[in-house]
């Protein structure tokens, strides 16, 4: 968990009135340097209250930071971004779910009504729903915890 970074997707620029939107835009300006995204582990380390937290608290804080880093200025997450996070940041829990009706229903909901966005509570429910039905959770339950 510590050291994981959220990656962002490249967004192409389309100039209004450009007859060829797929062509790369040209500019006489020097390219701007984009600030580097700070890793989740460094963001966690910067929160003083988290220094003495339990693993569970750090796990929830990590989820909250990933949500915040991916959400818009209103604190809402686009459904397409939520789906991308499931496929990139939560893939081990989602793996093997493709044939399960409930999983297909969840993905279908993310594909429909894309104008609706998720708040943090909805995002957590989404993650928990996939976790509960995942094969990985079964493997975790089978881990030996005592000698």
From Swiss-Prot:
GO cellular component, one term: cilium
Predominant subcellular localization, coarse grouping: other
Highest taxon above the source species: Eukaryota
Residue ranges of the region described as Disordered: 1-32
Gene3D superfamilies xref list: EF-hand
Biased composition (Basic and acidic residues): 8-17
Family matches, as CDD domains: S-100
MF (Gene Ontology): calcium ion binding; calcium-dependent protein binding; transition metal ion binding
Record keyword S-adenosyl-L-methionine present: no
Keyword Phosphoprotein on entry: no
Keyword entries, A-Z: Cell projection, Cilium
Subcellular location: Cell projection, Cilium
Further comment: 'Sentan' means 'tip' in Japanese.
Protein task: May be a component of the linker structure that bridges the ciliary membrane and peripheral singlet microtubules.
PANTHER family listed in its UniProt record: PROTEIN S100-A1-RELATED, S100 CALCIUM-BINDING PROTEIN
Listed name of the protein: Sentan
Species whose genome carries this gene: Homo sapiens (Human)
Gene it is expressed from: SNTN
């Amino acid at each position: 968990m510590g050291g994981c970074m959220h990656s962002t997707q490249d967004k192409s620029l389309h100039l209004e009135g450009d007859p060829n939107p797929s062509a790369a835009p040209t500019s006489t300006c020097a390219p701007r340097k984009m600030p580097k995204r700070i890793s989740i582990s460094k963001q966690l380390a910067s929160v003083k209250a988290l220094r003495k937290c339990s693993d569970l608290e750090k796990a929830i804080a990590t989820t909250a930071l990933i949500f915040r880093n991916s959400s818009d200025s209103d604190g809402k997450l686009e459904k397409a971004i939520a789906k991308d996070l499931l496929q990139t940041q939560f893939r081990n829990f989602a793996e093997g779910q493709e044939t399960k009706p409930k999983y297909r229903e969840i993905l279908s909901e993310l594909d429909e009504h894309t104008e609706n966005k998720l708040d943090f509570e909805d995002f957590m429910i989404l993650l928990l729903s996939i976790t509960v039905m995942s094969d990985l959770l079964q493997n975790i339950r089978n881990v030996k915890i005592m000698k």
